[in-house]
Swiss-Prot record:
It is found in: Cytoplasm. This is Thymidylate synthase. DUMP binds at residues 133-134, 178-181, 189, 219-221. The gene is thyA. Signal peptide: none annotated.
Amino acid sequence: MTKADLLFKDNITKIMSEGVFSEQARPRYKNGEMANSKYITGAFAEYDLSKGEFPITTLRPIPIKSAIKEIFWIYQDQTNDLVVLNDKYGVTYWNDWEVGHTGTIGQRYGAVVKKHNIISKLLKQLEDNPWNRRNVISLWDYEAFEETEGLLPCAFQTMFDVRRVNGELYLDATLTQRSNDMLVAHHINAMQYVALQMMIAKHFGWRVGKFFYFINNLHIYDNQFEQAQELLKRQPSECNPKLVLNVPDGTDFFDIKPDDFALVDYDPIKPQLRFDLAI
């Protein structure tokens, strides 16, 4: 059993046995009913990527390709334009969060990255002084929230640190998330930001180090309890999945493409489970 599978089962068990029910929930199911959830607070996980620990479960298939494309949309294209996400990457699941008929998700995610020139500033800081302690990506922009409607960012802050170990530089990352749908999005979000960590490390020719993941509200929606029990019953696959970025060290961050990533040794348990998402 991989570390990700162990933590997945532990979190499901903890939510189902110790979690409390939400009240006055904002999300709705497609039938219009309120999407309440059972949740715990303050969930934390640590993975040492340099030792082959990756935050992806084998208990069900995780659609990692589309998740990584979303990261490119946010941090390379730096846009909130759904046409770009749909046409360039073939990813459509954000369409449910379109604001009005604007063709965008509002001033969120990529729009905030572009507004503050976040990636270029981050890369410059790391180039000038890899050991500085100010390498922060923050998508929590109150001014942007007042400017337009739109879903507030769930994965809203990422921090980076560099360590020298036996003469080699390792890039660590910490992802902070205000809210996470445990069964559907947990490993998608984690692997997205591992991909971002790998892109930044490759830009400098560094190795990837540790990935820390903190979630304030970790939940299972009340229409997913049956799927939660099914996942607890499943025995994990014997594979040991790893995400690989097949570009030379020193490849510019903006020259990396989604197809440069490969998920190897991944043989998840099937069949896939169906989820009615909360919007």
